[in-house]
C-alpha cells in the first residue's frame, strides 16, 4: 500500500508543533521524520514514487514572498531519483517542474489529491513523468552550472 512520508528540518523552537502534527497523524500510513541525514533522505527518494512540495501554500506571494521556495533544491533532488514532483504552482519549484511533462503543479488541496490519484491510477504515465524528471534534473547539475557561468562571463 501507499505511505505518506513527511521529511524535513525542524528547529528546536518548532518541536511542540512537530509533536502536535505527530499526534494528529497517528496512523500507520504516515511517517514524520525530522532532521534526518542526507543519506537517509537519499534512501527515501530512492523508494518514493511521488514527491509533494507545498512551500508557500496558504501564503500571499505579495505580502509574504519569503514564505515561498525561491529555488527548490529538494525538488531537483527528488527529480534526479525519478520521483514525480507535484509542486505548489507558485515560486521556484513551479519554474523547475514543467507541468504535465516532468511533474505536476497544484493550486488547491483538491488539485493535489486529484493529481496524486491520477498518478496512482496510471503507473505508466507516472513512470513517463519520472523519466522526464530525471532528464530535467540534469539541467541543474553543478558542472552544467559552471559551464553556463563561464559562457556568460565570456560574453563580457
Where do the language-model regions lie?
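Flexible glycine-rich beta->alpha loop in the catalytic core of nucleotide-sugar glycosyltransferases
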Residues: 56-58, 84, 91-92, 102, ...
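Short glycine/proline-enriched, acidic/aromatic patches that form the donor-sugar handling elements
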Residues: 41-42, 59-62, 91-96
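Acidic donor-binding loop of glycosyltransferase active sites
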Residues: 46-70, 83
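Glycosyltransferase donor-sugar binding loop
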Residues: 3-19, 34
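A charged, aromatic-enriched C-terminal amphipathic alpha-helix characteristic of glycosyltransferases
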Residues: 107, 111, 124-155
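Short hydrophobic beta-strand element within catalytic cores of glycosyltransferases
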Residues: 75-80, 84-87
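Conserved acidic donor-binding segment of nucleotide-sugar-dependent glycosyltransferases
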Residues: 89, 98-110, 117-124
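Nucleotide-activated donor-binding/catalytic signature segment of Leloir-type glycosyltransferases, i.e.
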Residues: 18-43
Amino acid at each position: 500500500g501507499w505511505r505518506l512520508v513527511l521529511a524535513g528540518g525542524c528547529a528546536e523552537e518548532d518541536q511542540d508543533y512537530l509533536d502536535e502534527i505527530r499526534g494528529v497523524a497517528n496512523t500507520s500510513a504516515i511517517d514524520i521524520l525530522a532532521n534526518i541525514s542526507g543519506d537517509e533522505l537519499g534512501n527515501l527518494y530512492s523508494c518514493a514514487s511521488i514527491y509533494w512540495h507545498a512551500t508557500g501554500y496558504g501564503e500571499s506571494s505579495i505580502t509574504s514572498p519569503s514564505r515561498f521556495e525561491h529555488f527548490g533544491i529538494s525538488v531537483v533532488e527528488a527529480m534526479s531519483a525519478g520521483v514525480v514532483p507535484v509542486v505548489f504552482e507558485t515560486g521556484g519549484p513551479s519554474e523547475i517542474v514543467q507541468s504535465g511533462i516532468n511533474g505536476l503543479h497544484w493550486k488547491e488541496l483538491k488539485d493535489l489529491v486529484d493529481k496524486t490519484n491520477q498518478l496512482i491510477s496510471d503507473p505508466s504515465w507516472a513512470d513517463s513523468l519520472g523519466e522526464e524528471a530525471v532528464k530535467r534534473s540534469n539541467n541543474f547539475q553543478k558542472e552544467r552550472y559552471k559551464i553556463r557561468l563561464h559562457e556568460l562571463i565570456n560574453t563580457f
